[in-house]
Curated annotation (Swiss-Prot):
Region (NMP): 30-59
Catalytic activity: AMP + ATP = 2 ADP
UniProt GO molecular function: adenylate kinase activity; ATP binding
Pathways per UniProt: Purine metabolism; AMP biosynthesis via salvage pathway; AMP from ADP: step 1/1
Binding site for ATP: G10, A11, G12, K13, G14, T15, R127, T136, Y137, Q199
Protein name: Adenylate kinase
Residues at which AMP binds: T31, R36, D57, L58, V59, G85, F86, P87, R88, Q92, R160, R171
């Protein structure tokens, strides 16, 4: 089962990825994990990536694609994989097709967890944190016992800058602009499967399992 998982921040990708890899016995491969492993193992490409990251630069496609190819060639990917955070561009998607072809593999499904923007805003801007205990709450989904106060020590909860509406809105817009061409690309190729993320997480996963039980036409 060779899969790509897509979805905007707040769509619940992490939760669903964990369920998929546990049930199907395939590795969850995120770009960050790949970079960290390649740098830790001091592979040639890992060292190249490190030099760009240390300089505060974006890692060029050729290095990223090389690291992806190395990772997908490993033994644990023999029965499949779940890619998360790659590809991010059409050029990377086309390169991935070449990688899979060279490995005698092809994609089965591209899952896109779709959630209305206003719900993503609610999920992402509702987070509150205690600056003293580090405990995280959500004003809708996991509120403290006393509004605005930490359950543990009564400290005032704060909203991190990353969770403020203007920051979240900008992040969603950037992500949406980036992923729209990829969604169109995979839809045209018949790989795309839209998943309704505006449901409880178990229902979302039941929908994903139903999709994964189908054979691609």
């Amino acid at each position: 089962m060779n899969l790509i998982l897509m979805g905007l921040p707040g769509a619940g990708k992490g939760t669903q990825a964990e369920k998929i890899v546990n049930d199907y016995g395939i590795p969850h491969i995120s770009t960050g994990d790949m970079f960290r492993a390649a740098m830790k193992n001091e592979t040639e490409l890992g060292l190249k990536a490190k030099s760009f990251i240390d300089a505060g630069d974006l890692v060029p496609d050729e290095v990223t694609i090389g690291i992806v190819k190395e990772r997908l060639s490993e033994d644990d990917c023999e029965n499949g994989f779940l890619l998360d955070g790659f590809p991010r561009t059409i050029a990377q998607a086309e390169a991935l097709e070449g990688i899979l072809s060279s490995l005698g593999k092809q994609l089965d499904h591209v899952l896109n967890i779709a959630v209305p923007k206003e719900l993503l805003m609610e999920r992402l801007t509702g987070r509150r944190v205690s600056p003293t205990t580090g405990k995280t709450y959500h004003i809708v989904y996991n509120p403290p016992k006393v509004e605005g106060k930490c359950d543990i020590d009564g400290s005032d909860l704060i909203q991190r800058d990353d969770d403020k509406p203007e920051t979240v809105k900008r992040r969603l817009e950037v992500n949406e602009k980036q992923t729209k061409p990829l969604i169109d690309f995979y839809e045209a190729k018949g790989y795309l499967r839209q998943v309704d993320g505006n449901q409880d997480m178990n229902t979302v996963y039941a929908d994903i399992k139903a999709i994964l039980s189908e054979k691609r036409a």
